[in-house]
A protein has these predicted regions:
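Hydrophobic transmembrane alpha-helices and immediately adjacent juxtamembrane helices
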Residues: 1-260
Length: 260
């Protein structure tokens, strides 16, 4: 019964999103064009770096291209639904619309994570997938290698998703959080496309444990070239989920409405 309810909720949200996409389909093609321009500029930057040095923070030119593809995939997946939905939920804490979700008998976290769906960022996912597949084929293929990367990528995205829910829970308790999500998304867009080891150690710690950009992008991309990353990602994912669930339960118990 619960699974059927989830499917009905997802179908209703998907239907509304598809209707919105059709009404603003020109925006999708513009997003694809802009994503292509951004990707071209990033590849040009990587070519410039590769022409000056063969290795950057331990990453070869091929590895940097693969990292860029992973960055596009993660950024697109997060911005399709989770990022705009959690931002909208935190806004709803102030205007009262979040109470409708919290009073709903359905799965709250599911509704929060899919309340807003934007199809424009799918262009990032498509372009990123194209880059990673091309790099995989150029590296000689290998289904086991690809499967290892896909699992690592899923764990990395799951860790970042749990972090978004953690911020949403903290937003309920402190009546803040929107600015944190916006800043984190900017970090994801700008810093995530470069190797984590390129930064100073204090910033590496921040990008791993405070805003898990490294765990979502650099570590999964590195797992394509080196094995042994899945254990780290599995532990980080489990820890992030437990922390997010604990924070969310505390937030729900302490929340008394938008007028507080």
């Amino acid at each position: 019964m619960r699974i059927r309810y989830l499917i009905r909720c997802f179908s209703a949200l998907l239907k509304m999103s598809v209707t919105r996409l059709w009404a603003y389909r020109t925006d999708f093609w513009m997003s694809l064009l802009l994503s292509g321009i951004t990707l071209s500029a990033d590849l040009l930057g990587l070519w410039f770096v590769a022409s000056r040095t063969s290795v950057l923070a331990g990453w070869s030119a091929q590895g940097l291209v693969f990292l860029l593809g992973t960055h596009f995939i993660v950024l697109g997946v997060i911005e399709v639904a989770l990022y705009p939905s959690t931002v909208r939920f935190i806004e709803g804490i102030h205007d009262g619309s979040a109470d409708l979700i919290l009073l709903n008998p359905g799965p709250r976290l599911f509704l929060i994570g899919l309340s807003e769906v934007a199809f424009g960022p799918l262009t990032h996912v498509l372009l990123g997938a194209g880059i990673t597949i091309a790099t995989w084929l150029n590296a000689g293929g290998g289904l086991l290698r690809l499967a290892h990367y896909v699992v690592a990528l899923a764990l990395g995205i799951g860790t970042l998703a749990a972090w978004c829910y953690l911020i949403a829970g903290l937003g309920m308790m402190m009546r803040r959080g929107k600015g944190v999500l916006i800043v984190a998304n900017q970090i994801l867009e700008t810093v995530g496309r470069w190797p984590l080891g390129l930064h100073a150690l204090p910033l590496q710690i921040v990008l791993t444990f405070v805003v898990p950009v490294g765990l979502a992008i650099t570590v999964p991309a590195n797992s394509f070239f080196e094995s042994g990353q899945l254990a780290l990602l599995a532990v980080s994912f489990a820890g992030s989920v437990l922390l997010a669930i604990g924070t969310w339960r505390m937030a729900v118990r302490s929340y008394i409405g938008a007028q507080s």
